[in-house]
Amino acid sequence: LKKSKFISSIVIGFLTLGLLAGCGAQSTNKATSNDQKWELKAGHVAASSHPMNTELITMAKQIEEKTKGRVKISVFPEATLGGEREMLEGAKLGTMDIVLATTAVTGNFDPKMKIFDLPFLFKDREQAIKVLDGPIGQQLLDGMSSQGLVGLSFWENGFRNLTNSKRPIEKPADIKGLKIRTMENPIHLDAWKALGASPTPMAFAEVFTALQQGTIDGQENPLAIISTSRLYEVQKYVALTKHNYSPMVLIISKKVWDAFPDDIKAIFKEQAMSNAKVERQMLKEADEKYIADMKKFGTVITTPDTTPFREMVKPVYDKYSKDIGEDIIKQILDTK
């Protein structure tokens, strides 16, 4: 009996030590977490003068201040760290930290993101923002986690518009036969084919020279890209077709995210949303200036009635709605 009591005492002693050790480990980990510092890189492909770059730099400064220097973010515009697909692949692997990428490319990682490639999905900016900042937008951001990516918020690249060097665009027939540079995106390609154009996939870095040399007749991009990349210098005509609303997704590598303590995660979430709202407003105000500047340059700007365009691209919806999700498409179209 004495022997049994002795053994029990030893066991209890070891258990007590184990619990104390466990508590010590937790406090040590907590201290390490609070003391740890991160130096992160954030990349995107837009020009350094684009509002998204300006606001991303602001966000980096605010996060550094709020984390008391524990997180420092360096921002790299103009594809310095690679193209969007390359950067997202890096974020998935944990070799890249933060990426601000178009949904046209993020759709290759999560098919649900391809919904934004559908032409004429949104009537205006207000409808788009209501969707992106609501349950549908959050559902789409959450879907990135299965790819080793964390979607933080939707920023904005604006509505995509059509430019060309041949003629003003007033109706679908004016597009017929034009060689239009597009991204290598099947929905975009099918949409332009449905409108009678000859879509030509091409890396954006090659577009200015191709337009200058007449290899292609036109291209389509938001006004911010058309202006900050000075495409209007080699394009006589701009049609405000607003055929695609182009959100940007602020994404962080899940490997980086999982290493953050809760307080830093909360700061990132708060800043991701607040800075997105500022960037959108900056872009809205900038769009008016971009149009005025292009008119001064001599660019011919038209605002075609998009009703007949919408009719012509209905087969594109029929082709892709099943893969993307008929329910979510209907929810967006029904949003007022």
Predicted regions and their residues:
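Short, low-complexity disordered leader/linker segments with a strong preference
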Residues: L1-E39
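N-terminal secretory/targeting leader peptides
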Residues: G24-Q127, I136, M144-K336
